[in-house]
Amino acid sequence: MVKNKAFFGQIMEERDNPAFFKILRREDHSTEMMRMIPHHLIRSISDKSSSFKMVLRVPWGRSWQVKISKNPNFHYMEDRGWNQFVNDNGLGENEYLTFTHEANMCFNVTIFEADGTEMLRPRKTITSSSGRNKREERKSIYKDVKKEEEIESWSESSHPCHKTAESTSGRLTQKQELNLRKKEADKTEKSKTSKKKKVETVSNDSEAGTSSLIPEFKLTIKKSHLLFLGIPKKFVDMHMPTETTMFKIHYPRGKKSWDVTYVVTDVQSRFSGGWSRLAKELGLLVGDVCTFKLIKPTEMRVKVSKE
């Protein structure tokens, strides 16, 4: 029935009207190849009905107009209209779509979920502005992230002059600065006490002939941590690589592991590529407490406590 096993734009024969299918994957649903329209389908439509636009219509009555362009090799749907269609329907999770040409470049689109269930009505979470809402939500998260980075960068600095913090954030109020100074003073005092206890512990371990403690750090999950995870500066300085490195993070309780890219930056080194997937599959929520233990130079073990 299908000429080859690719995931995009293949012609479907053995039916009255020309049709093709696509499987939408998150990583490539907006690429030019994914937006390709099979050459055989274009040829099967008469010149009178073809145009530089097509209409995508779903079973519950909504439709989207998408412009068509052509490169030296094939015709394809332009990204603006295609992405609007994908975003409005919340697609990109391995859905199977069939496109059947009815007339005048109007295509009936049938959508099947990854489990094979046909979508006969819009998802409850989807509205006409879902694409815009997602972009606004992501923009809001990044604003929160930037603010957190500015505050953390200032509070972690050992320079006594607060002008550095002012030039970094530019928006911190006097009250926030006073609070940060107080927190920094408390942090310094706790750090001295912690270092003293650590020296005593390591000393006792040495006397007892045991190995040194496994390096670890603990973080309470914030909103930004669902996208990427900033590593505490002191832990970075003492234990982490000085260049971008691939880490493997293990979750012994679920017997799972993930490959995550550790990115080194001037502001804050962090787990980036692969981290959001880990956070999603672990079901991390704001307020959860995660403990990370460095078991090998590029491997960590994570423990999650639900608060």
From Swiss-Prot:
InterPro entries, sorted: B3_DNA-bd (IPR003340), DNA-bd_pseudobarrel_sf (IPR015300), REM16-like (IPR044837)
Q: Where is the composition biased (Basic and acidic residues)?
A: 178-192
Print the keywords alphabetically. DNA-binding, Nucleus, Repeat, Transcription, Transcription regulation
Q: Where is the composition biased (Polar residues)?
A: 166-177
What is any one of the record's Gene Ontology cellular component terms?
nucleus
The organism sits in which domain of life?
Eukaryota
What is the name of the protein in this document? Answer: B3 domain-containing protein At5g18000
Give the start-end ranges of region Disordered. Answer: 122-141, 151-209
Entry's Gene Ontology molecular function annotations: DNA binding; protein heterodimerization activity
A single BP term in Gene Ontology: synergid death
Q: Which compartments does it reside in?
A: Nucleus
Q: Which SUPFAM superfamilies match?
A: DNA-binding pseudobarrel domain
